[in-house]
């Protein structure tokens, strides 16, 4: 569970769909189906009314005290209030609220956001003129002139790059900052997607525990019935032993599922950056919210909004500016300067006009790039970087398109499997079990066949959960590729 989530789309596909496909491909190694961890939506519980009727028909009934209608009415109102209170509490925190909490507290996101802020600070650095140069010179041996000895010199010089160089540097810095923001956005969306994976895993584990416990209650009923029939000499001890074996298998699997649930909660809290024992309210349903779009619309949305693709586009923009900037750096730069020379008075001449007058000098300088190899290499380097980024954009677009088609295929497959188990297979097995139990009451049906059908029912219920999980995760992955959780700089709250 703590495997590092690689920052590329192929790795995401492996974590989600290939893992799901591998789990679906594995058959249960024994007759008793293994309960897997994953995701699910609201799954109906197995019907147990027939088991209760079967139990009443084969076991001595206990006399119960009849409750008055008034008492039953008060109890019903009380239970309804409890359910309403619990529902409001369970829905107090949704997945979105947990994700927003992670967006505020996750250290990885904070580090990425600080890198974005750091990149913003480079713009005023590269877009400024070079610092002016100030020089002071003192003549140890004064230079004698007609108006007096020159004793000191103060010089001020300001260099200027070629026209447009500073604006090019600012453009490069802005493009790099935007690319870093898209990188932050990609990490934010990736963390949200990982939380959705764990969120669905938590829900599925909870559903699996519920189904396993309901099946355990049914097995307990069958065990009581088989014991009663064995005590009355109507069946052999083998039926009792088989029921006990099924009972222990289910208990073991339930304990494993509870351990998995605890581990998933700890992993979920890592993203929130809270104590690992902090409570996580497991959802009572899953809804894969995604706008119904066709393949072409989804592809267009991904091309426009995917943060990784937008990051490369800003890198391309910066590379284009770098090509122009490298060319401008091969142009001359110039500077202007001003000198002040302090001059002393002559003492050997009287009535000298301008005696001791200070001198003022204006200067202009040029930096001529005569050695062209260095500047030509810079231009070539910038062009190669630009070509590299453009090829990366084409590669990523192709990968995103392939990932989208894979997700759409997995979504269709999950929907078909869910419909199969939800509307056909489970109902057929339940019908067969009901018939077998009625026959067993008449000492006609085989107890082992009842257990086998019960295992088959459990298997189909778990496969229905897995199909719903695959459907949810396929939609979540498409949303991740589409950048549905993208934000703008104005929406940041750090």
List the predicted regions and their residue ranges.
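Hydrophobic/aromatic residues within transmembrane alpha-helices of membrane transport systems
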Residues: 102, 112, 156, 202, ...
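Short Gly/Ser/Thr- and charged-rich N-terminal loops/segments
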Residues: 34, 38, 42
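Bacterial Sec-pathway N-terminal export signals of envelope proteins
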Residues: 81-85, 90-138, 159-161, 165-168, ...
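A glycine-/polar-enriched beta->alpha junction
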Residues: 100-110, 117-131, 154-171, 182-189, ...
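Glycine-biased, low-complexity coil/linker segments
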Residues: 20, 48, 71-73, 82
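Amphipathic alpha-helical coiled-coil segments
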Residues: 111-123, 187, 191-211, 228, ...
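Small/polar, glycine/serine/threonine/aspartate-rich low-complexity segments that form flexible
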Residues: 135-171, 282-292, 324, 337-374, ...
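Periplasmic alpha-helical coiled-coil/stalk elements that build and connect Gram-negative outer-membrane
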Residues: 190-303, 315, 407-410, 414
């Amino acid at each position: 569970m703590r495997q590092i989530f690689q920052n590329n789309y192929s790795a995401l596909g492996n974590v989600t769909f290939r893992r799901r496909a591998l789990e679906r491909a594995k058959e249960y190694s024994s007759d008793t189906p293994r309960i897997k961890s994953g995701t699910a939506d609201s799954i109906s519980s197995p019907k147990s009314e027939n088991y209760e009727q079967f139990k009443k028909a084969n076991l001595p009934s206990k006399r119960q005290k009849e409750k008055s209608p008034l008492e039953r009415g008060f109890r019903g109102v009380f239970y309804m209030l409890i359910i309403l209170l619990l529902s409001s509490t369970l829905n107090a925190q949704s997945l979105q609220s947990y994700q927003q909490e992670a967006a505020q507290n996750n250290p990885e996101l904070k580090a990425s956001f600080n890198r974005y802020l750091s990149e913003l600070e480079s713009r005023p650095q590269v877009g400024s003129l070079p610092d002016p140069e100030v020089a002071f010179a003192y003549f140890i041996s004064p230079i004698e002139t007609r108006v007096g000895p020159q004793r000191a010199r103060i010089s001020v010089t300001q260099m200027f790059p070629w026209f447009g160089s500073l604006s090019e540097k600012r453009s490069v810095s802005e493009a790099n900052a935007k690319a870093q923001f898209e990188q932050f956005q990609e990490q934010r969306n990736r963390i949200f997607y990982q939380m959705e994976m764990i969120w669905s895993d938590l829900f599925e584990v909870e559903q699996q525990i519920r189904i396993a416990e309901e099946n355990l209650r049914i097995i307990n009923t069958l065990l009581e019935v088989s014991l009663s029939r064995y005590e009355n000499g109507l069946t052999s001890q083998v039926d009792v032993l088989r029921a006990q074996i099924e009972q222990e298998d289910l208990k073991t699997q339930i304990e494993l599922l509870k351990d998995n649930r605890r581990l998933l909660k700890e992993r979920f809290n890592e993203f929130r950056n809270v104590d690992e024992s902090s409570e996580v309210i497991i959802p009572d349903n899953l809804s894969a919210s995604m706008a119904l779009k066709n393949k072409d619309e989804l592809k267009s949305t991904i091309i426009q909004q995917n943060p990784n693709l937008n990051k490369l586009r800003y890198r391309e923009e910066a590379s284009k500016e770098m090509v122009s900037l490298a060319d401008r750096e091969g142009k001359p730069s110039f500077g202007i300067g001003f000198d002040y020379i302090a001059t002393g008075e002559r003492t050997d001449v009287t009535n000298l006009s301008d005696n001791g007058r200070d001198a003022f000098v204006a200067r202009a300088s040029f930096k001529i790039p005569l050695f062209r190899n260095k500047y030509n290499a810079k231009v070539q380097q910038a062009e190669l970087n630009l070509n590299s980024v453009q090829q990366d954009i084409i590669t990523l677009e192709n990968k995103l398109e392939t990932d989208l088609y894979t997700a759409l295929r997995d979504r269709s497959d999950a929907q078909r499997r869910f419909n199969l188990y939800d509307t056909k297979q489970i109902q057929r097995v339940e019908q067969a079990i009901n018939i077998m139990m009625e026959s067993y009451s008449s000492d006609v049906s085989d107890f082992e066949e009842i257990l086998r059908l019960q295992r088959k029912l459990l298997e189909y219920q778990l496969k229905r959960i897995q199909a719903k999980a695959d459907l949810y995760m396929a939609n979540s992955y498409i949303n991740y590729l589409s950048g549905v959780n993208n934000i703008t700089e104005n929406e940041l709250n750090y």
